[in-house]
Every structure is written in structure tokens, then in C-alpha cells.
């Protein structure tokens, strides 16, 4: 594993991610923003933020597996949520938890959450980018 995740003392400990990732590998993997499309390009969970978050994470898992990686190799996530408000956090966490259970992982690398006005198509409520480092 080329990534070590750390919560430094002096920074708040966040349940859903770590504050710092230390990358020691040499192969960088940049995964395009994943939306809630299945393998056929059909939107999963129309109108359901939790279902869409879950599908985004599953898509990232598929992309990582294709290049010989896993969520253990993820150094950074960027999450874009349409019309973000803090009351959407439980849905975001529910989707993450469901994906983690299916993938057998805990996706806790450093993450940035950004509220956006819109994504590529109106049905998409969330998009997630990942950067990974492989040995």
C-alpha cells in the first residue's frame, strides 16, 4: 500500500475521512469524476442522493480495480454535490456506508466537499473524483 492516512494532533478528528495522506508510491492514478451511471450509462438512483453516492463509490472501485488498485490506494477524494446544504450529510454518509459495505472498505482518505449549482445532466446529484497512488 502506497498511502498512509493520518489525523494529526492539533486538527479535528473527522469520522468520515482523514486529514492527511502520505503517498510513497510512484504511479499516480487520476480517476475522472464519477457520477451515478451504471455500466450501460443509465443513471442509478434518480432523485436519491444516497443511492447516487453509493454508485459513485462503486464506480471508483471498478476504475481502481481495472488498474490494479483499491480504495487503500486513494490519496484524495473531491465530492461535488448539487445544491449542498448540511442537512444532506446523512444521505451522503448513508451512500458512503452502503458502498463501503459492498466493497469491504472504509473510504476515509482526505476529502473535499463542494456544493455546486449543477452537474453535467440534471439527474446527477453528486460527482466524485479520486486520486490514487500505486507502488
Where do the protein language model's features map onto the residues?
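N-terminal presequence-like segments and the immediate start of the first folded domain
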Residues: 1-58, 62-75, 82-135
Amino acid at each position: 500500500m502506497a498511502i498512509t492516512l493520518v489525523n494529526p494532533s492539533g486538527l479535528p478528528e473527522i469520522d468520515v475521512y482523514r486529514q492527511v495522506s502520505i503517498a510513497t508510491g510512484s504511479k499516480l492514478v487520476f480517476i475522472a469524476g464519477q457520477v451515478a451511471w451504471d455500466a450501460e450509462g443509465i443513471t442509478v438512483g434518480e432523485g436519491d442522493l444516497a443511492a447516487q453516492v453509493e454508485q459513485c463509490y462503486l464506480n471508483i472501485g471498478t476504475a481502481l480495480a481495472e488498474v490494479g488498485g483499491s480504495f487503500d490506494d486513494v490519496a484524495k477524494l473531491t465530492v461535488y454535490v448539487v445544491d449542498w446544504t448540511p442537512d444532506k450529510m446523512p444521505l451522503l454518509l448513508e451512500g458512503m456506508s452502503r458502498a463501503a459495505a459492498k466493497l469491504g472498505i472504509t473510504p476515509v482518505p482526505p476529502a473535499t466537499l463542494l456544493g455546486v449549482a449543477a452537474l453535467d445532466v440534471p439527474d446527477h446529484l453528486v460527482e466524485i473524483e479520486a486520486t490514487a497512488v500505486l507502488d
